[in-house]
A protein has these predicted regions:
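Regulatory/sensor and coupling segments of signal-transduction and defense proteins
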Residues: 1-185
Length: 185
């Protein structure tokens, strides 16, 4: 990985995000059954999570797009419309334009979240031919951020080095660094 060759300070947040992304990818990526395909396909659209739920074997896809300002919902359909390089470039440019006008402070976190949701909700997090493409990039990024926040708090609470604990040592996965809570109100 590129992080190995990077000359980063011991407390660089990249170490936290690197591990959090690996944990999130493990949680949201699943291998396709009965496939021999290798490599990546950047044109693959986001698939519906209901394709394989409860033993289903369906093929429904979201159309390349974003959250519509008009309130139209992008329902999955049987037609598989590929993503294009131009579509990815359009999304990148729109996000860059939004980021330029953003005040990077705690008050703008909801604005950042809204920009990410609007642009990445129908983009697959994985374009691997070996994996299902049914988790959006928005959901993957949001999960990565949540895990990063937990790791950050854990390391700082325990006065631990980011690089040593997350990258040099190999036992962080065995630590009780997370607490998952669920409740109904």
């Amino acid at each position: 990985s590129e992080i190995k060759s990077a000359h980063l300070k011991e407390d660089n947040l990249a170490y936290i995000v690197y591990l959090a992304d690996n944990i999130a990818a493990f949680a949201d990526r699943r291998k396709k059954e009965d496939t021999e395909e290798k490599g990546f396909d950047l044109s693959v659209p986001l698939q519906s999570v209901f394709n394989v739920l409860n033993g289903n074997n369906q093929r429904f896809y979201y159309q390349p797009g974003d959250m519509d300002d008009q309130g139209k919902i992008n329902y999955p359909a049987s037609e598989k419309k590929p993503f294009s390089r131009e579509f990815y470039m359009k999304i990148c440019q729109r996000m860059l334009d939004n980021f330029r006008g953003m005040n990077w402070s705690e008050e703008y976190l909801n604005s950042l979240l809204a920009v990410m949701e609007a642009n990445l909700s129908y983009m697959p997090s994985s374009t691997s031919n070996e994996e299902l493409s049914d988790i959006s990039l928005f959901d993957h990024v949001k999960l990565t951020a949540a895990i990063s926040s937990c790791i950050y708090d854990y390391l700082n609470e325990n006065h631990l080095s980011y690089k040593t604990e997350l990258f040099d040592k190999k036992d962080f996965y065995d630590r009780n660094a997370f607490l998952l809570c669920s409740m109904d109100i």
